[in-house]
Amino acid sequence: MIRVTGTAAPAMSVVFPTSWRQPVMLPLRSAKTFKPHTFLDLKGGKEMSEFHEVELKVRDYELDQFGVVNNAVYANYCQHGMHEFLESIGINCDEVARSGEALAISELTMNFLAPLRSGDKFVVKVNISRTSAARIYFDHSILKLPNQEVILEAKATVVWLDNKHRPVRIPSSIRSKFVHFLRQNDTV
């Protein structure tokens, strides 16, 4: 018990509960290891080695009070790179949304390695690390140009949602676009 006294106010007591416990700290989950393209069964279990690249430049309004890109902005960079990649293989996220379905990021893990500052040019690299019936797993890297310094590494899980926002299997018309892209990548 702590007793507080003073001349301006009457004495009062503050009692801390005796049953209070320190919170339990759970260990962080380790990075998941995936078998690539399990539902497509392509490439004999090899990863897609080609990255789709999008070049961008840091804008002043993306900076925080310390003069570096705010951490939350990197999620936008990753999502933009992913949308550009999907569009390059014939999947338009806006059209998917207008149809009532959605592609939603259900998990995003980012490892910040170095900062970006105003005016920096950089490239967002995106590839598919794995797919399942209802999910697509992406790997992202952000590299500062021109020296290719690694700024960020990220992993994203994207879920295909129906018009009631429930996870569903990726439609066969979309799945065929992944198959076409991966087969085309194999021949290059």
From Swiss-Prot:
- Annotated signal sequence is none
- What is its EC class? hydrolase
Q: Does the keyword Isomerase apply?
A: no
InterPro entries this protein is in?
Answer: 4-hydroxybenzoyl-CoA_TE, HotDog_dom_sf
| UniProt tissue specificity | Expressed specifically in anther walls (endothecium) and in microspores.
The Gene Ontology terms for molecular function here are: fatty acyl-[ACP] hydrolase activity
Which superkingdom? Eukaryota
- Please give the Gene3D superfamilies that the UniProt record associates with this protein: Hotdog Thioesterase
Report the subcellular localization: Plastid, Chloroplast
Which SUPFAM superfamilies does the UniProt record give? Thioesterase/thiol ester dehydrase-isomerase (SSF54637)
Q: Which UniProt keywords apply?
A: Chloroplast, Hydrolase, Lipid metabolism, Plastid, Transit peptide
Q: Which GO terms describe its cellular component?
A: chloroplast
Transit peptide endpoints, chain numbering: 1-47
Q: What is its EC number?
A: 3.1.2.-
Swiss-Prot/TrEMBL GO biological process terms: lipid metabolic process
Annotated active site:
64
| Claim: Plastid is one of the keywords in the record | yes
Q: Describe the task this protein carries out.
A: Acyl-ACP thioesterase involved in the production of fatty acids and beta-keto fatty acids. Can produce fatty acids of medium to long chain (6:0, 8:0, 10:0 and 16:1) and small amounts of medium to long chain beta-keto fatty acids (8:0, 14:0 and 16:1) when expressed in a heterologous organism (E.coli). Possesses thioesterase activity for lauroyl-ACP (12:0-ACP) in vitro. May play a role in the development of floral organs by generating short chain fatty acids.
| Family affiliation | Belongs to the 4-hydroxybenzoyl-CoA thioesterase family.
| Protein name from the UniProt record | Acyl-acyl carrier protein thioesterase ATL4, chloroplastic
Species of origin reads Arabidopsis thaliana
